[in-house]
Amino acid sequence: MDAIILCAGKGTRLHPITESRPKPMIPIAGKPIIEHIIEKIENHVEKIYLIVGYQKEKIIDYFKDNPKIEYILQEKQLGTGHAVLTAKNFIKGDFLVLNGDVIFEDSIDEILNYENAVSLSNVDNPENFGVIELGYDNKIINLLEKPKKEEITSNLINAGIYKLQNSVFGILENLAPSERGEIELTDALKKLIENGKLHGVELKGYWNDIGHPWDVLSANNHFLNKIISKVSGKIENTVSITGNVIIEEGAVIKPNSVIEGPAIIKSGSIVGPLAYVRPNTVLMKNTFVGNSSEIKGSIIFENTKIPHLSYVGDSIIGANCNFGCNTITANLRFDDKPVIVNIKGKPVKSVRKLGAIIGDCVKTGIQVSFMPGVKIGSNSLIGANCLIDRDIEQESFVYKKDELVITKKRN
């Protein structure tokens, strides 16, 4: 049996992080979402076909040494069903299909017992997903995409993991495009439901559909709490390390720094002196957290520098960023309500604590502050003494026009 993983989409709800990488390459607990998926299935399949499109080189380069993986280009993103169809000539028998942006803990063993099956997850907000109604013997009797609250009959939703027979390709080929003009995999599933040929298997463990920045941080927190301590880097004098912490070889923790796990500090990173890394933090390769800086519950991407007197909380900071002295990310509203984030032009409630979401190659001057939930596009410059209270598009230069008044002093 082979597997197909859908990785071609742009992930626009995760801008600015996905301005520079495909969504499946966003790191969760130090490794890409798609790597977590592959680890779950690779012992069950002979080949893994990654359906790639947007920024495909990032995926291909990362997995170039894995002999099980092959790549199929979806030149135009014409729907999930169309993406699966691109693999038709490569798949000879039954196969798995997985969305490239779902992360989960359960084994896939149970779904393999059926000819056609969908993994299900029990969630608190089913209106945001495809809601599944189960009948006798785990047969699916209804699938309703993003229903109104009054239409919801179940909290079980389509978890984006499928076991399908080869005959599904024939169903997909005969589907009419949806209202969006796309070939939808869910329309093929509805055909199977009509014929009583689709089963549902409920996942009992953790599952998350990574659709928003706070989903990234939530999944990161969950999987960090599964790590086992391993300290291979250089730990200098008077360093305090508590909890489960991974410090890779080549990382350096300088004197008087405090590391509280769970946390991961990757190779080439330098922390301190007198730095504070708090729980649920990941420092990717070659990052620098300097004197009297504090990082809490955040993901700091490769080659980013947060040199001194800065605070980063509940934030995602892209690669190759450089923060000026006393750069601060606020992460909590005065009224304790969920932080509002602008997603594709609409205000969306996120979570109680959320800092800044900053793209790659952003530089800040001294004393820059970011209000909760703001997003800063890639390759932007933020001048000194700015308070950023709104989203900034990529390639922007932001500065403050304060007038400096100089007069003769009084005698």
From Swiss-Prot:
Entries under CDD domains matching the protein: LbH_G1P_TT_C_like, NTP_transferase
Enzyme nomenclature, EC number: 2.7.7.23, 2.3.1.157
Pathway: Nucleotide-sugar biosynthesis; UDP-N-acetyl-alpha-D-glucosamine biosynthesis; N-acetyl-alpha-D-glucosamine 1-phosphate from alpha-D-glucosamine 6-phosphate (route II): step 2/2; Nucleotide-sugar biosynthesis; UDP-N-acetyl-alpha-D-glucosamine biosynthesis; UDP-N-acetyl-alpha-D-glucosamine from N-acetyl-alpha-D-glucosamine 1-phosphate: step 1/1
InterPro entries (UniProt xref): Bifunctiontional_GlmU_arc-type (IPR023915), GlmU-like (IPR050065), Hexapep (IPR001451), NTP_transferase_dom (IPR005835), Nucleotide-diphossugar_trans (IPR029044), Trimer_LpxA-like_sf (IPR011004)
Stretch list, region Linker: 205-224
Class of this enzyme: transferase
UniProt-annotated catalytic positions: 308
Residues noted as binding UTP in the record, renumbered to the chain: 6-9, 74, 79
Short name of any one Pfam family annotated for the protein: Hexapep
Functional description taken from the UniProt entry: Catalyzes the last two sequential reactions in the de novo biosynthetic pathway for UDP-N-acetyl-glucosamine (UDP-GlcNAc). Responsible for the acetylation of GlcN-1-P to GlcNAc-1-P, and for the uridyl transfer from UTP to GlcNAc-1-P, to produce UDP-GlcNAc and pyrophosphate.
Name this protein carries in UniProt: Bifunctional protein GlmU
Organism: Methanococcus maripaludis (strain DSM 14266 / JCM 13030 / NBRC 101832 / S2 / LL)
Lineage of the organism: Archaea, Methanobacteriati, Methanobacteriota, Methanomada group, Methanococci
